Amino acid sequence: VPPGFTPF
């Protein structure tokens, strides 16, 4: 996942 994105 991209930085700052929490889900999975």
From Swiss-Prot:
> What is the superkingdom listed in this entry's lineage?
Eukaryota
Q: In which tissues is it expressed?
A: Expressed by the skin glands.
Work out whether the entry's keyword set contains Secreted: yes
Renumbered to this chain, the signal peptide range is none
Where's it found, cell-wise?
Secreted
MF terms in GO: toxin activity
Q: Single GO cellular component annotation?
A: extracellular region
Q: Which UniProt keywords apply?
A: Amphibian defense peptide, G-protein coupled receptor impairing toxin, Secreted, Toxin, Vasoactive, Vasodilator
BP term (GO), one: vasodilation
Q: What does this protein do?
A: Produces in vitro relaxation of rat arterial smooth muscle and constriction of intestinal smooth muscle. May target bradykinin receptors (BDKRB).
Per the similarity annotation, which family is this? Belongs to the bradykinin-related peptide family.
Protein name listed in UniProt: Des-Arg9-[Val1,Thr6]-bradykinin
Q: Which organism is it from?
A: Pithecopus hypochondrialis
